[in-house]
């Protein structure tokens, strides 16, 4: 057992040294995966013999050890094969030889040159997905390891092999639009290039092989040629699915980015919306018509037309945080995890000592939705006596703050 502990310690120490070394040589990464293989082989053998602790290391389940050992064996053998080719002399970082990158699409090949491609659906900036594309793919074939060039266009993510078979798509944005889009329109932004106004449901786009755009030839772009925009820049402003356009190396948007939420007029008259008014359907995001109406109004127009906020007094209408008369509150703040755990304990052990408790909330910045300050919850009480009983019997963990106040409804 002592020998197994020593071998396990050496394997783990080797991994730490190679990680800290940050080498760009493929031979060092082969040594790393050899150490991972040794570690999990020892843990698997120990678990099979009923050992749960080996040295200072807990032994995982045998299935976990077996799977990790298989991964290490595959990575070790693949890197050894790659090191015997002309690609073995290239610089390789440890991330380039990680299992997660090796198994990302397209699977079981080594990848370099990662960049992010942004796909915006329905012209809605809040409905955006990001995809990772690699410029170089090292793929194992029957003739050995070969280098393939990869990229993105209006159809999806692709790679081109040296055999000249054209673009091979391993991810298509049209299929993603079927999941995330309601109109079928999407635009693709890849560094300083944009493919705008693409529709996954239009007949001309669907009938062409591999989604070739109208600006391309009948055979599509030649293999290895840099992709061109699917539409001229001058026509982008009329496209419903195109918000960003290309302008040199920067990006210019056609108007301000819309806020993802749209509130009807008069909704700002009350801080608390009655829960008896359900929200039906998706929240609209097009704010352009409303912005034009607000610009045409005079500054005093809101004062001339007072907003009437309906007030529900019947308990049958639904839940009300504030009740008639004065209500007692306790505002509790702390870190997000502290507040969440505190609310859980209070609801479980002291539910009879208060009326209601809100979910965790944050104060947001003036611009955007960036959180400021600490997390907060608001607890309501039926009377000052109930609040005193709560403060007496419910301890407040260190690092959290509590403030008490009394409020009443104005309308």
Curated annotation (Swiss-Prot):
GO terms for molecular function: DNA binding; DNA-binding transcription factor activity; nucleotide binding. Its main location: host cell. GO terms for cellular component: host cell nucleus. It comes from the Viruses. HAMAP family: PPV_E2. This is Regulatory protein E2. Plays a role in the initiation of viral DNA replication. A dimer of E2 interacts with a dimer of E1 in order to improve specificity of E1 DNA binding activity. Once the complex recognizes and binds DNA at specific sites, the E2 dimer is removed from DNA. E2 also regulates viral transcription through binding to the E2RE response element (5'-ACCNNNNNNGGT-3') present in multiple copies in the regulatory regions of the viral genome. Activates or represses transcription depending on E2RE's position with regards to proximal promoter elements including the TATA-box. Keywords: Activator, DNA replication, DNA-binding, Early protein, Host nucleus, Phosphoprotein, Repressor, Transcription, Transcription regulation.
């Amino acid at each position: 057992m002592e020998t197994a502990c020593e071998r396990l310690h050496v394997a783990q120490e080797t991994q730490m040294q190679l990680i800290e070394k940050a080498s760009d040589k493929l031979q060092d990464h082969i040594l790393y995966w050899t150490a991972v293989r040794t570690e999990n082989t020892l843990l698997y053998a120990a678990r099979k013999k009923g050992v749960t602790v080996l040295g200072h290391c807990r032994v995982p389940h045998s299935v976990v050890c077996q799977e990790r050992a298989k991964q290490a064996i595959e990575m070790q053998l693949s890197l050894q094969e790659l090191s015997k080719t002309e690609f073995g002399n290239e610089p390789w970082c440890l991330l380039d030889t990680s299992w997660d990158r090796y198994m990302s699409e397209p699977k079981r090949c080594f990848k370099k040159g990662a960049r992010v491609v942004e796909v915006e659906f329905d012209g809605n900036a809040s409905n955006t997905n990001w995809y990772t594309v690699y410029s170089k793919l090292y793929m194992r074939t029957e003739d050995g390891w070969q280098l393939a060039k990869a990229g993105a266009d209006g159809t999806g993510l692709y790679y081109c092999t040296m055999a000249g078979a054209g673009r091979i798509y391993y991810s298509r944005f049209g299929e993603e639009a079927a999941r995330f889009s309601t109109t079928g329109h999407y635009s693709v932004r890849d560094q300083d290039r944009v493919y705008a106004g693409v529709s996954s449901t239009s007949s001309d786009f669907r009938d062409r092989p591999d989604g070739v755009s109208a600006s391309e030839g009948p055979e599509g772009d030649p293999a290895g040629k840099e992709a061109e925009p699917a539409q001229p820049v001058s026509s982008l402003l009329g496209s419903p699915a195109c918000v960003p356009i290309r302008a040199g190396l920067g990006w210019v948007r056609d108007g301000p980015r819309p806020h993802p939420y749209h509130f009807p007029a008069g909704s700002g008259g009350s801080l608390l919306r009655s829960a008896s008014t359900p929200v039906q359907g998706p929240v609209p995001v097009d704010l352009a018509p409303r912005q034009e109406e607000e610009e045409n109004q005079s500054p005093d127009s809101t004062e001339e037309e007072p907003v009437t906020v309906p007030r529900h007094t019947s308990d049958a209408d639904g839940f009300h945080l504030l009740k008639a008369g004065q209500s007692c509150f306790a505002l509790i703040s702390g870190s997000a995890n502290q507040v969440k755990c505190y609310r859980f304990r209070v609801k479980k052990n002291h539910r009879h000592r208060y009326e209601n408790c809100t979910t965790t909330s944050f104060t947001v910045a003036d611009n955007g939705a960036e959180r400021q300050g600490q997390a907060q919850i608001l607890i309501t009480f039926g009377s000052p006596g109930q609040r005193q009983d709560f403060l007496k019997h419910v301890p407040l963990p260190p690092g959290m703050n509590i403030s008490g106040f009394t409020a009443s409804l104005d309308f």
